[in-house]
């Protein structure tokens, strides 16, 4: 073989060796593919929706005052009592046309506070337009300052749900028991008791409609209780 042929052969071999690349790491390649797939899937997953919070609205928009002479009609409003699901924050409904014994929660709707707290707040506001409404523990202060023992009003919330009579027709249903007690030196004395049942139509067959119907039911119950308290001697 001539010198030129040998040089040409060495050059050809050298070029081929330079073009050969070591094989890539198969595990690294697989990792890149998996990361890409996971990133794509993450973009497809929706974030969980936050529940919508409801209450009874802002209430009275103007300031009110009760004359001092109304102290003799002052009432201590105890905490509203409720049991079971009514003491939670879920907005509940019943399908009267299917199974009225089953309470069902709206999946994405919640009360801003348990219904007993919201009901007490609304009753205090509505009843306070006609008389002095005191919190538990404030009656003793009134007794010391005015020599009066205010009566106590206890409320038991028994039903508070969005009731569907049919898929398109529904009402806000409220049922409560009110007990009026006289505070005496010898203890509490039962004066009167009243069962209040209110149904108010819902404007729409959904959670917002149920909330509006239940708000109207609470206001109607407060009006009924106000008239009842005025009639008890």
What are these regions (language model features)?
Residues 37-40:
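C-terminal motif of bacterial Sec signal peptides marking the signal peptidase cleavage site
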Residues 1-24:
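N-terminal secretory signal peptides that target proteins for export/translocation
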Residues 124, 128-132, 162, 226-233:
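Sec-exported extracytoplasmic/periplasmic mature domains
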Residues 92, 102-110, 184-227:
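Short secondary-structure boundary motifs at beta->alpha junctions and helix caps
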């Amino acid at each position: 073989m001539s010198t030129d042929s040998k040089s040409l052969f060495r050059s050809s071999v050298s070029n081929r060796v330079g073009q050969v690349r070591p094989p890539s790491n198969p595990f690294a390649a697989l990792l890149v593919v998996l990361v890409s797939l996971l990133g794509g899937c993450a973009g497809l997953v929706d974030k969980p929706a936050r529940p919508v919070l409801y209450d009874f609205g802002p209430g009275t928009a103007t300031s009110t005052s009760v004359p001092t002479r109304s102290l003799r009609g002052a009432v201590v409003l105890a905490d509203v009592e409720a049991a079971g699901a009514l003491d939670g924050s879920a907005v509940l409904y019943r399908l009267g046309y299917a199974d009225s014994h089953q309470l069902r929660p709206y999946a994405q709707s919640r009360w801003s506070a348990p219904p007993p707290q919201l009901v007490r707040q609304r009753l205090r506001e509505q009843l306070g337009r006609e008389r002095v409404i005191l919190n538990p523990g404030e009656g003793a202060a009134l007794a010391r300052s005015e020599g009066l023992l205010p009566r106590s009003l206890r409320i038991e919330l028994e039903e508070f749900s969005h009731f569907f009579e049919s898929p398109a027709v529904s009402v806000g249903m409220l049922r409560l028991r009110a007990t009026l007690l006289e505070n005496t030196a010898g203890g509490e004395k039962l004066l009167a008791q009243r069962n209040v049942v209110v149904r108010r139509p819902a404007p729409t067959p959904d959670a917002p409609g149920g909330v509006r119907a239940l708000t109207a039911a609470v206001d109607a119950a407060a009006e009924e209780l106000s008239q009842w308290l005025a009639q008890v001697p």
